[in-house]
Every structure is written in C-alpha cells, then in structure tokens.
C-alpha cells in the first residue's frame, strides 16, 4: 500500500520503483543486507539496539527516518473485556508469518507476559487470521496495519470480535522504547452508533525507510 504510493510519487520525477512483496520487516532487512533490494520499509524494534552505542554500525544500511506509525491491533473473541495480554494465556493466537515484523513484536510482547511459544501460537496473518478469528477457530490475532487497512476495518465491524485496549500502555512504552502509545478515539468508526464506545489505547512502532 505505502510502497505503491511512493512508486506513484517517484514516477512523477522519472524514477521507476520495482515493488517486491515480502513476508515483512525481517525479510526486507535480509534482502537489503544481501543487496537484493535497495530500499525497504523496516518496522521499528526489529533491529536490536547495540550494546555499545559508540561502536560503529557495520551493517552498511542507513535509515532515512521514521515514515509513519504502524499500530499493533490485538483482536480477540471473549465474553468479557480483556485489557492485558496475560489474559490470553492458553488461547490460540495468530502472531504472523515467519520473517514478519508482527511476529517478532508479538513474541516480544507475549514473552514479557510469560506466554510461551507453543502450539497455541499460529503463523497466520492479515485477512487469513481475520477469517479464522471470525469463524472462532482462533481466539486472538495480532495485526500490524494502518487504521484504514481492510483487515482492520473488517475485524472492527465483525460481530463477536473485540479490540484490546492496552491498560498497561505506559509500562509497555517504558519497557520497549521503540513503541509509542496511541489512542483510537471513541466514536471514530461510527459516530451514530458511538463505536467504539470508549477510547482504545494501542501501541505502535514506526516504519523506517532503510537504504
């Protein structure tokens, strides 16, 4: 989506951008390091911070800056309202495909809540995860996408599916400095139906443009 927008902008200046689909940030990073791509979006937090900030970076890669926020949406099915990830213990959770930034971040957040990597964590992403959640075959799904992305809009409007508001958003931001806390305002989806009925607190890394 964002790559296509940049391709359109660059085309106006005579620059042709070849868009390559990938599983996500980890694969993008690998392609950049292997010179299989010259420019890529990489999710904040994917590259661990250097133990010694004074040591020179020898990766050969350069960040041109943070381009936009990528909210982390945790959708779930449950009779009660959940506000903490620890409440998903023992549930079947879609955490994204291997090589994706959503999978890495989901693992970091779940590890922090003592939720082990076992057969309850399934490698589903996007609309595939949304369909499984709608059908009740999984209990929760991590989605990283813009608010306007089809998968987010589909799940927000799905009967029986709820969106988690992170009660511990400040604690996550303190523990994971690459995350920013954002608010999904009350009524933003539908003013007439007043949906969502309350502000939703979400977390978001940034997408960085790497060359």
Regions from the language model: what does each represent?
Residues 1-13, 70-135:
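Bilobed "Venus flytrap"/periplasmic-binding protein-like clamshell domains
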Residues 1-39:
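Extracytoplasmic small-molecule ligand-binding "clamshell" domains
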Residues 16-19, 29, 60-61, 91-99, ...:
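Second-shell loop/turn segments in exported
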Residues 21-25, 35-48, 126, 143-149, ...:
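Beta->alpha turn/N-cap motifs
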Residues 28-30, 49-52, 83-84, 102-105, ...:
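Extracytoplasmic/secreted cell-surface and envelope-processing proteins
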Residues 57-67, 191-200:
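A structural signal for short loop-to-beta-strand junctions that line the ligand-binding cleft
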Residues 111, 117-210:
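Pocket-lining segment of extracytoplasmic ligand-binding domains
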């Amino acid at each position: 989506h964002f790559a296509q927008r940049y391709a359109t902008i660059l085309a106006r200046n005579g620059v042709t951008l070849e868009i390559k689909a990938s599983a996500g940030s980890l694969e993008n990073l690998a392609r950049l390091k292997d010179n299989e791509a010259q420019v890529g979006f990489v999710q904040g937090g994917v590259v661990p911070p250097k133990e010694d900030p004074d040591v020179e970076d020898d990766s050969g890669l350069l960040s041109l800056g943070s381009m936009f926020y990528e909210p982390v949406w945790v959708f779930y099915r449950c009779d009660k309202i959940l506000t903490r990830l620890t409440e998903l213990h023992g549930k079947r959770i879609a955490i994204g495909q291997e090589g994706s930034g959503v999978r890495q971040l989901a693992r970091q957040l779940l590890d922090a809540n003592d939720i082990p990597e076992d057969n309850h964590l399934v490698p589903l992403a996007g609309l595939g995860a949304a369909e499984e959640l709608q059908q009740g075959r999984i209990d929760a799904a991590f989605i990283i996408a813009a608010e306007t992305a089809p998968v987010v809009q589909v799940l927000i409007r799905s009967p029986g599916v709820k969106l988690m508001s992170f009660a511990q958003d400040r604690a996550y931001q303190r523990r994971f400095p690459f995350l920013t806390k954002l608010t999904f305002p009350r009524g933003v989806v539908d003013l007439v139906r007043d949906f969502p009925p309350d502000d939703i607190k979400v977390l978001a890394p940034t997408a960085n443009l790497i060359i």
